[in-house]
């Protein structure tokens, strides 16, 4: 009966019912300014020249200083031969050098390629070659590896920089006199120790503790030192002539579905995305906020909602290269951020930290969660313990990335990814052809259209044709829309489990198991079943010091799920595989399960 009533609804996607949820300050039709990212930086420099733009481990860069650094490095890149349309690869964590390199490249009309520092050489080789990158900026910790890898790519110049380049004098001294480790994986866990370096005291001990944070770079042709370059080049304030359709970056997909693809995002995409986001948060004032820069900038979520949004609004960005829970809590206490975009894992880890109840998080005006679904129970628990409000949203690399958000000052439906942001159209279509609209309330594939939607995939016309159809971006996500225009992500299309002829969405199972008081993380997959075709298996990480049995979890599910959704297997693990931004890799668990069964 309920389904019949849903089918008979008169609301259609063309009606755009979500617009009724817009606050009075959100226009139903946006009038976009014809400005681009370099213009936004220049505007913030003019309006807030002496305001802190970036803070890294206590080192402060004002907007005026940031522009000077950008102009100097732009002059350097120009001397390397970089011009409009050329690709520059950035292989850095969240550092001052990362922000400067990005804006210097796009100021020249170059195309940025943001690479993940934790990727293995074959992954980086693919991205360097696919993008045609000519110059690479990286840490000294990775430089020797990249010098060796360069022979397999078209990269001509490498710029090496150090974590010590922008730190208060005492910290810089320790790093520059430390040991010579060359593995990026070695240095990441040690980053929180930087804050514990004494100005006076046992420097020898500090050197030993921090010897993993710097490295010698071997001599090689066309390998340059960052600080020397900035000192030797005068600022070049020239700007390339930019258009909406010019590509600003090749943002490679996370590889959760196979070989990463280079998403071509344009200057128009990124500019309009920032304008869409800005109008959504009316209480966040230009030049007056502090953003927690914990999301990695090599991921488009962090790049847009932290790095570029902060520059657009003239805010202070607290750079966090390694966002561990204790470090996040310390930064929130010391720097009092007002805007904190995070991913679910960061919320969960802070929530499980023993100091969470002692932490004062009242400075936060808005929390934004994206990249992966945030379990409803986690939202409730985090808000109860912190007093902060979490706004959940949705997006993907191909949409710059945000398409949906819960209203900041309107009705917030917990569990929903919200409503389409201004100038964004959405439909739910059938899974078979992708051409027919599903009745409102019934699941189908979410497709979106808007100024933030990518130009296409680099060197992949076949994939572009499948994903972009008549301007509509086919997300691969199964979703529903309610009568008010709020959207709910049911699951990934490729993750759906078919059990006994019924569609089972793993997120439904995950949500229930997250409600169990002993469970910290959960991820469901489909496994072969002799009679049903597929059945549900769940991988679980328990909270610290908790114990549970398979029967206990299954019995918990039996009182909360339809019989065809009941798990038949539970596997407890110490940790689950994740991307570098904390998204649980369901495909990896599925592959591990297939391999295990194949090997008997």
Where are the language model's segments positioned?
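Conserved adenylate-forming
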Residues: 77-83, 232-246, 250-293, 313-315, ...
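Gly/Ser/Thr-rich phosphate-binding loop
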Residues: 177, 337-342, 351-412, 425, ...
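Conserved pre-ATP/AMP-binding loop-to-beta segment of ANL
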Residues: 185-252, 259, 284-290
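A short helix-loop-beta submotif of the ANL/AMP-binding
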Residues: 87, 93-113, 117-121, 129-135, ...
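AMP-binding/adenylate-forming catalytic core of the ANL superfamily
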Residues: 136, 450, 455-456, 463-466, ...
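Conserved AMP-binding/adenylate-forming core of the ANL superfamily
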Residues: 31-33, 38, 42, 50-83, ...
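Conserved ATP/PPi-binding loop(s) of AMP-dependent carboxylate-activating enzymes
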Residues: 419-423, 434-467, 504
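Conserved AMP-binding/adenylation subdomain of ANL enzymes
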Residues: 271-290, 298-339, 353
């Amino acid at each position: 009966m309920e389904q019949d009533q849903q089918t008979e609804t008169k609301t259609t996607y063309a009606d755009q019912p979500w617009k009724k949820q817009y606050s009075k300050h959100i226009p139903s039709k946006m009038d976009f300014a014809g400005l681009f990212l370099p213009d936004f930086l220049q505007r913030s420099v003019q309006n807030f020249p002496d305001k802190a733009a970036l803070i890294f481990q206590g080192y402060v860069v004002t907007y005026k200083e940031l522009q000077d650094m950008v102009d100097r490095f732009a002059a350097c890149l120009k001397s390397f031969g970089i011009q409009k349309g050329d690709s520059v690869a950035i292989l850095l964590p969240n550092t001052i050098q990362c922000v400067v390199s990005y804006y210097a490249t796009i100021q020249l009309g170059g195309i940025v390629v943001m690479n993940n520092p934790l990727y293995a050489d074959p992954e980086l080789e693919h991205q360097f070659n696919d993008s045609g990158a000519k110059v690479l900026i990286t840490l000294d910790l990775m430089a020797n590896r990249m010098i060796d890898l360069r022979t397999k790519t078209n990269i001509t110049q490498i710029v090496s920089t150090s974590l010590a380049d922008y730190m208060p004098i005492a910290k810089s001294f320790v790093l520059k006199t430390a040991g010579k480790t060359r593995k990026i994986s070695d240095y990441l866990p040690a980053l929180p120790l930087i804050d514990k370096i004494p100005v006076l005291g046992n420097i020898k001990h500090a050197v030993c503790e921090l010897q993993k944070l710097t490295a010698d770079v071997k001599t090689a042709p066309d390998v340059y030192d960052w600080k020397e370059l900035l000192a030797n080049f005068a600022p070049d304030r020239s700007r390339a002539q930019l258009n909406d359709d010019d590509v600003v970056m090749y943002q490679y997909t996370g590889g959760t579905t196979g070989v990463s693809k280079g998403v071509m995002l344009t200057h128009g995409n990124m500019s309009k995305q920032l304008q869409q986001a800005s109008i959504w948060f009316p209480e966040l004032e230009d030049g007056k906020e502090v953003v927690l820069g914990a999301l990695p900038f090599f991921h488009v979520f962090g790049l847009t909602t932290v790095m570029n949004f902060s520059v657009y609004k003239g805010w202070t960005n607290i750079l966090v290269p390694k966002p561990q829970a204790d470090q996040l809590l310390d930064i929130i206490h010391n720097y009092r951020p007002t805007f904190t975009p995070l991913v679910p894992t960061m919320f969960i880890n802070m929530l499980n930290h023993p100091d969470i109840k002692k932490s004062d998080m009242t400075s936060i005006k808005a929390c934004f969660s994206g990249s992966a679904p945030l379990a409803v129970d986690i939202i409730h628990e985090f808000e109860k313990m912190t007093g902060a409000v979490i706004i959940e949203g949705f997006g993907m690399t191909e949409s710059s990335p945000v398409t949906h958000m819960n209203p900041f000052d309107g009705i917030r439906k917990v569990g929903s990814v919200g409503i389409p942001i201004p100038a964004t159209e959405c439909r739910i279509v059938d899974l078979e052809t992708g051409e027919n609209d599903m009745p409102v309330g019934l699941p189908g594939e979410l497709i979106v259209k808007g100024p933030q939607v990518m130009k296409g995939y680099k060197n992949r016309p076949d994939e572009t044709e499948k994903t972009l159809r008549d301007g509509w971006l086919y997300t691969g996500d199964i979703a529903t829309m309610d009568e008010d225009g709020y959207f709910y992500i049911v699951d990934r299309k490729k993750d759906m489990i078919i059990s006994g002829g019924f569609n089972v969405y793993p997120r439904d199972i995950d949500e229930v198991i997250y409600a169990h008081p002993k469970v910290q993380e959960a991820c469901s997959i489909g496994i072969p079943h002799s009679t049903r075709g597929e059945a549900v298996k769940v991988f679980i990480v328990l909270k610290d010091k908790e114990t549970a049995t398979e029967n206990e979890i299954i019995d918990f599910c039996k009182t909360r799920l339809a019989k065809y959704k009941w798990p038949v297997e539970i596997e407890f693990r110490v940790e689950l595989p994740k991307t570098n931004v904390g998204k649980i890799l369901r495909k990896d668990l599925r592959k591990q399960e297939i391999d295990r069964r194949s090997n008997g």
